[in-house]
């Protein structure tokens, strides 16, 4: 009797099918047959349309808004693949929803990022891949391998192509928590670093107290992982411009863009904003430029499949 060959199969939910198609095309394969629909009462119905027994499977599904719908789709897809005897189930979550709920900021707060990690693991995921986790300590919430991929190489490449870094420039971290991300960006480009000192009196509100570093007369490139309402981003751009920056550019990995964020950015001091396609958006204004994560995710998936190093992707 012939033994079935262990193949790689890539699945996608409904959260960002466009990105999943780009990733599969980069790898040189097709998306596996899977239908994620709804029953009449709204319950999620997953139908796997081909065999996965003994195969290495990858599910591409960011848990972006509507976060609970997309997370539940992902969990049910994992369960379906596990019960169909997949050899491995790697979940590729470009944007990890609930990542900002990673600690108890005050009494009786939940740590929802940990809860999501538990749900993914119990459902049957054997590996998680994500991009620019909001808090790196979330990696410790998992008892299965987690690959936190960095987006800075693709943004740095795009900035060079668009000649943004031909002028005198500075990489700006919008807060102390993002310094490591901004420093990696600055090291990749070989440029200086500035840091905004800010505090948050309440959720989605930030007050800038000081700018550490020189921005006067320079192209300031703000590097951040998430733009939700974009109030913090717009305020940062305003403060930088008031300090004499020649122009302000932004690089944002995860464009949540809720609560009027697009209009807010349009009317801000930001000249150009580069975003990834971790979250799908359509009909964006010309000020927005989308940089695809597909090559990064595709390369990482291939390396996981072949048991090759992933960290080499982020070395100089």
UniProtKB/Swiss-Prot annotation:
Keywords: ATP-binding, Cytoplasm, Kinase, Magnesium, Metal-binding, Nucleotide biosynthesis, Nucleotide-binding, Transferase. GO terms for biological process: 5-phosphoribose 1-diphosphate biosynthetic process; purine nucleotide biosynthetic process; ribonucleoside monophosphate biosynthetic process. It is an enzyme of class 2 (transferase). GO terms for molecular function: ATP binding; kinase activity; magnesium ion binding; ribose phosphate diphosphokinase activity. Pathway: Metabolic intermediate biosynthesis; 5-phospho-alpha-D-ribose 1-diphosphate biosynthesis; 5-phospho-alpha-D-ribose 1-diphosphate from D-ribose 5-phosphate (route I): step 1/1. Its cofactor is Mg(2+). It catalyses: D-ribose 5-phosphate + ATP = 5-phospho-alpha-D-ribose 1-diphosphate + AMP + H(+). InterPro entries: PRib_PP_synth_CS, Pribosyltran_N, PRibTrfase_dom, PRTase-like, Rib-P_diPkinase, Rib-P_diPkinase_bac. Pfam families: Pribosyl_synth, Pribosyltran_N. Mg(2+) 2 binds at residue 175. HAMAP family: RibP_PPkinase_B. PANTHER family: RIBOSE-PHOSPHATE DIPHOSPHOKINASE FAMILY MEMBER, RIBOSE-PHOSPHATE PYROPHOSPHOKINASE 1, CHLOROPLASTIC. NCBIfam families: PRK01259.1 (NF002320), ribP_PPkin (TIGR01251). This is Ribose-phosphate pyrophosphokinase. It comes from Thermosipho africanus (strain TCF52B). The lineage of its organism: Bacteria, Thermotogati, Thermotogota, Thermotogae, Thermotogales.
